[in-house]
Amino acid sequence: MADRRLNPRADLLTTIAQSKLNGELLPQEFLDGSWLLIIFAGNDTSRNSLSGTIRLMTQFPEQRALVLEDPSLIPNMSEEALRMVSPVIHMRRTAIQDSELNGQRIAEDEKLVLWYGAANRDPEVFPNPDKFDVSRDNAEKHLAFGHGVHKCLGSRIAKMQLRMAFERIFDRFPQIVWTGKQTISPNALVHAISSLRVNLYGPNKKRPVIVQNL
């Protein structure tokens, strides 16, 4: 962050480092907390989405075949996986004024729960919403990271990590098969896959190279 103050760039860290409050640059403890928040926000969703995508690849083998045949689908596949997995289950908000949304009246100070997973499978937005479709033309319209001013700070990091991870994984292990064993941590906020048992197959497609937990 100190470097971004001396050598500003066109990125988020520079924006934070150069921000001012009451005419003064933000204190160091705020800067440290900000970049740590970005890293953790991007890492947690990435881990759960990575495991969830591997599970989807086993459940929808025809989609896995499409990606293996055309790796350029990986970025859109990552968006579609985020839609299907919805790593953050919900978020709570407080209405700051009386409002009406789609016919539903919302009073000032009323608490609301936003169910991202439900929105991401809205059939009016995503036809055949329960299908994992790596070619879906509006996959990026998902709300896995929220929306507007409260959109997750780690969204870009998470997307970059997913894309790079699957480029490497599919290059080394073209066939990854979920064994059906998994451990879901009890968590009301995030879709926490703490363990996913898989078989990794090398390019020869003969036998599992190793059994791993993702």
Feature map (PLM): residue ranges:
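Cytochrome P450
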Residues: 1-214
